[in-house]
Structure formats: structure tokens, C-alpha cells
């Protein structure tokens, strides 16, 4: 019998202190798995993978996401309490519990719901109630977009402070783990516009050929 081995803390090697690890909030991993399933089916033209468990995977992960999406007073669906691919942002400044409306998560979910719709149109059996809710959610997931048309990494991201990278480089030299340097200084990367992994930019790589879901 196994026991729980999920990582809940990790070591900051700058100050040698154990810090909370909230990477379990990166629910977007399920979207990437479905996306890879789609890539496989497109490259091989082998749809037997869908009838051999693939469709079940799509349906069950869709159930999870539709349950997590909540309709707001603005008429848009919002997904809260998650982390995007960028591990430097675990929550809003001074808060806990993840961030809201991560662009990567919301647009990848929109893509998944679109594919679910396409599969239904091709004759694959999708539960009626699931499909009906997918139609509502896929066109109304919220994105935070500024006046210049730039997509924010997540809701209120552009309200975060900017980082003086030159100052950090002058002080430390190697800043590839600037998050640990910040935490050792007693501040949090959650407060700043700084990223570890490609997050919003990953959308362009994944969905650029689809016009970033124009009119999503």
C-alpha cells in the first residue's frame, strides 16, 4: 500500500528555508494531456485512440473544468484558484489560493471545448448535458485584455509592480531563480511582473495556427 508523496514544501537554496509548494494548483496539466491527444490523432489520423479511452479522458477532464468554471455578474465564466505554467505566481499579493482567469488555462479550455463540439458533430457520443454546458462556457470564458489589446497572464496581472532586472543582475549576477532571491529578501514574486515559464506566450505556440481562437 502506497502513501501520499505529493510535494507540499520545497527548499529555497538561497536562504535554506523550506517554503510552501503550491504547484498542485497547476490544473492546466490535464489540458496539455488532451492537447497532446489531439496532436497524436492529427498526425497519425488514427482515431481509434479516441474510442480506446481517449474520449473518456476528454469527457472526464471537461466535467472537471465545467464544474470549476463559475458564471460571474459580468456574464462571463471565471476560473479561480489555479496556477498557470508560470510557477513564480502562486497567488495574489498577500493572499493564498491561486490566481483567477489564467489566460493559458482559459484559452486552452476554450480550445478543448471546441474540440469536444467537433467530436460530437463527427458522431462521437458526448453526454447531452455536458455538451450543452460546454456550448455556454466556451464562448464566455473571461480574459483580461488591456487597452492595447495585450492579453494579461491572468486577471489583474498588469496591476503588479515591474522588476528592475538590471539592479538584480548587478547585485547577484545569476538571476535565473530570481524568485528565490526575492523571497530571501523578504518579498514575493507574486507582487511583480516576472515569469519563470512561458505562460501566455505558450498559447501562441499551441494555438497560433488557429488564429488564437478568433472570436472565442
Task: Label the predicted regions.
Residues 35, 52, 106-110, 114, ...:
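Active-site core of glycosidic bond-cleaving carbohydrate-active enzymes
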Residues 55:
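Short conserved active-site loop signatures built around small residues
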